[in-house]
Amino acid sequence: MASNPPSAASPRRTAVSPGADRPDGPDPAGQRQSYHAGRLEPEQLATTWVEQFARWFADASTAGAGVPEANAAVFATASADGRPSARTVLLKGFDHRGFVIYTNYTSRKGRESAENPFGSLVFPWYTLERQVVAIGAVERVSRTETEQYFASRPRGSQLGAWASHQSQIIESRDVLDARAAELAARWPAGTPVPTPPFWGGLRLVPDTVEFWQGRTNRLHDRLRYRRVCTADRWAVERLSP
């Protein structure tokens, strides 16, 4: 059906060039990368998403891949009223149950995961022209898992977990340094540092895991594992790029 012509009262729209008010510098609209590193077909996929992720994670973790931190991912959450937030985190484990990260539970991601327990992880492996996107529910890992992982951390990281009241406003860096010094005196070298009660693991339990491979002309390959029932049965689907 043809749309009605604008009335005399309709405001006239003026075309504005993208970025007209931005500061001088590189123009993001002019930056283009052609993708041609590989392809992804259904017959190439592993039987399960976790096996496929393990393959790609191994590829990204090799020195020749040029990926600085293969376990780095963007973790997106949202508040109870739907306001999103995102940040880069480090993956610390994965298996058939999902992907595990660790954080301060009083941080923004910790609070949002409690009040709106859903999230997404994006692994951007740029040099391989690959991306993995997982979406699903977020749950806390067991205290046993948390304590086992915390015990494996470097002592400085353990003290840092106690020192940082993550996501809270502080007056200066001096506040952090003073807390760190106080905690180092409380637990001197050789003394086990206990796991903070406000710190622990989050597991993203995926409903979908999408594997993206860049292709020429923006006609990328997108293959998705999707949970189809509670019995852990999965469908594999190709998505239009």
From Swiss-Prot:
Its cofactor is FMN. Coiled coil: none annotated. It is an enzyme of class 1 (oxidoreductase). The keyword Ion transport does not apply. Pathway: Cofactor metabolism; pyridoxal 5'-phosphate salvage; pyridoxal 5'-phosphate from pyridoxamine 5'-phosphate: step 1/1; Cofactor metabolism; pyridoxal 5'-phosphate salvage; pyridoxal 5'-phosphate from pyridoxine 5'-phosphate: step 1/1. It comes from Frankia alni (strain DSM 45986 / CECT 9034 / ACN14a). Residues 1-35 are annotated as: Disordered. GO terms for molecular function: FMN binding; pyridoxamine phosphate oxidase activity. Its EC number is 1.4.3.5. Belongs to the pyridoxamine 5'-phosphate oxidase family. This is Pyridoxine/pyridoxamine 5'-phosphate oxidase. The keyword Flavoprotein applies. It comes from the Bacteria. It holds the Pfam family PNP_phzG_C. Binds 1 FMN per subunit. The gene is pdxH. Keywords: Flavoprotein, FMN, Oxidoreductase, Pyridoxine biosynthesis.
